[in-house]
């Protein structure tokens, strides 16, 4: 490109870049490309032609205006008419246009050529600068310099891991040119605390406008990442090393106090304060605040911050409530001790203590504590009040309690538990509301966990399954909540006849159950699996875990079907003294709830199962009579009432296959397949007609799931010529069961069992019972007593 008088004009007329981005180097390239002489314009106007010479070219050639932002307004004003007249000129400046004279000159030059903006170096450019192809070295320099050309070059001139003298000198020179406001901002930015505008203004004593202007100056001066507001890491390192430790601690403490005063997010700053081992009162408050902020999203980190706060001088009592909440989410709080709370924290402390009690499985105590926890606590207390039969109190507190929509929905759902068909949709709505916002509290129990037993009671295990799966996927309630929901899911599937999940979850989670509610779940799962496998040895093991749970005498309505498993285990191992008090407590709770039909049927079914387990025909008749007088609206309850009548007939030896078949279908259709198979098996054993017995045994096998085996790793290989069925019979004989019990478990008639036992004895060559048991030990590879 040429001017009217033949002079060459560069294609680029304006170069924009921060200090150290290579503006001067780029100017030199453009001058060299023009092939002529260049005249540099000095701060005093040297190099400028006389006004009378306009529009002639200056005698020296191309006018070069470097660092135009530093030129006095008068010099810039003299350059404007030259540019307007077409004088060949190229200008380099910082990104910020500092005055009207520079703006006018910039506009004139931009009209005659292109504007080039110098961008940070990329990885390819840094690799070229380093002269090596080591990707980690390139990445390190690129990260430390943010692609700033001069900083990257200075780093490249030093050995890896050492300070660059060139960079230190550059930063010191740049710092000396800054005004006091920009220097103060630079030193606080070097702390790497990502301070908000108001906090930065507070610590530097500047207004928001002054602080923002200082950041702009620092960006133009090459101190701050051109694409952000953070200081270039390598520059920050130099500034930090340039300050005495005492000065750094003072700066950090000033930031800590400002963050607390502003109510800002202190977590990022807390990391830096800890890194410099700040132990001032303000730092201690920052650590405590960080623990509070993180207790729900990252309870493990929250506990670490609370420890830091105590180490820095915070009274441990001030961390107790937060520590308890974080511990609840992690499942590390085992006992319900008094949680200290002072002043405004007193109600909060009571709510947390009430939640601790709920997680310990003590709903009554939880309700009492939560009722003292202010308006929010009273709303949180409603499910526990309903669970323990304090229904009128629950209604009153639900009406008076104040809190978010999710908790009001949860209270409404809890009040509706007498009618599962109405309650479950409300629990779902509460769960959805809870998922849309942050509650800011650990729940005594989640909507999903409360909905599960109610849905199962209503014959809707699939909804319970779905809700619990959703809670697990979302991590609701932290690690402890996931653990709890997984155990509940295993129990739901156990009740629905899906034993595989119950076996695997119990194996994975049973040993780590810490809270009282989870120990109850584990005991119920253990007892339920042993009951369904017919394994008396494992039932005794399960009872050993269940007995301490029952001894607590803490009963609530949501536990009713869980307690069925434990009480049946007590009956089976002849521990009747544990049964009466629990049944009485359950009856009291159901009565205080107004004996809602669904729960009344469930309680009556529990009585029936205990009578069947105890082989008490008279008690079976009494329980059946009680159930048949009820008129439940739900299909599951109607199926249970009909089955109760058939149990009474079957145990009396009156087997009517035509009457029994629809009852079995009803139980299976309402997700009680194991109960149906058990009734069919007992009817088959008592049937006098071989054809009827055969039909019922086939039906029992259809209804039965695969045999429950608690130790999935244990396998028995056929030995001594025993068939697969004979090995099954041998295992049950070794566990001490009678022929009748074996027949009930395997859906075989006692005669068939007797035939199998005789064949096994013959194959093993045993002539006495002692020899027979010894031979079984050899074949099965375990002691019968272990069973």
Task: Describe these PLM feature segments.
Residues 70-117:
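Sensor-1/coupling segment of RecA-like P-loop NTPase cores
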Residues 132-170, 183, 223-226:
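Amphipathic alpha-helical "lid/sensor" segments that cap RecA-like P-loop NTPase cores
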Residues 24, 76, 166-167, 192-198, ...:
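Short capping/hinge segments at domain boundaries that bridge a core fold to an adjacent linker or tail
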Residues 698, 711-787:
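Helix-turn-helix DNA-binding segment
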Residues 162-195, 203-206:
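Winged-helix-like regulatory helical subdomains adjacent to P-loop NTPase cores
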Residues 198, 226-227, 264-267, 316-322, ...:
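Alpha-solenoid helical repeat architecture
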Residues 220, 310-311, 337, 341-344, ...:
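Amphipathic alpha-helical segments of tetratricopeptide repeats
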Residues 12, 249-330, 657-669, 673-679:
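Extended alpha-helical scaffolding segments used for macromolecular assembly and cargo binding
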